[in-house]
């Protein structure tokens, strides 16, 4: 289903290239954007089928996939009278959750893609999308080709780097109507920062300076785009990840190892679901436990042979499993699996 969405994950483009799905054009006004999409990504429109009517869609397709996100928007609302299986990617499901959930239900959506098993791990999702428990298909971000190992392990700083956003529920960027329900939900639970562990690290930057460097923004700043992510990864042996209070592995969980940097993350099962294993292809610490985090950094920074073996296994692991083509094939397999059962 195409409605003129501006951006897309790299694996979605690979999915289009690999499987040549038909495109359902929800409104003719999106045709110029579709042509721009094809031209930008050097796709041959003659290799694809285009469908412009609900009747044609029902006659041709068994499954309707939508990667637009924002189902509450008119251009992305689910096609209610499509008789086949409907699977929608929620993307950032924190935007206007009530309207999004109502649109999914009204449109008869059967399953949703998510960045992890949100129905098991994210209390916000559980509260706002109760009808989709057991109906979430987890899809990892994967990593772009630019994330390459450029600096040998031995030449990197023997420290951990903390980087990424530190979103809050009260900063100027997020105190907008889109996030009102999200902010209210977590503030009522006594939480101030979406990236809770990163905020804990910010508060201990000086104390941890001997073993940790930090590029984490300080409130009210929540993001920092002033540095090159690939270059920064290549400067360090380890980096620290954060699953946020939404509990999903961020893109950095795949990008960092692809760039040759060992991930340190919590022992939350959202990482294990994607086959990250402590001491094998990552290093885990107890959730929100700074003492355990410090202990793990101390151990591996003095056991570099073990750390280098983890680095090698992790790099091979993510390059085989989480390149965009591999993620696209995973999505196709998951859709096929769901179809066979419904």
Regions found by a protein language model. Name each.
Residues 1-253, 264-275:
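Nucleotide-sugar donor-binding catalytic core of glycosyltransferases
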Residues 99-100, 274-283, 295-296, 313:
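Acidic, glycine-centered active-site loop in nucleotide-sugar glycosyltransferases
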Residues 256-258:
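Short alpha-helix at the nucleotide-sugar/activated-sugar donor binding site of glycosyltransferases
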Residues 282-288, 299-304:
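Conserved acidic donor-binding segment of nucleotide-sugar-dependent glycosyltransferases
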Residues 302-336:
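A charged, aromatic-enriched C-terminal amphipathic alpha-helix characteristic of glycosyltransferases
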Residues 336-342:
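Generic C-terminal helix-cap and adjacent flexible tail
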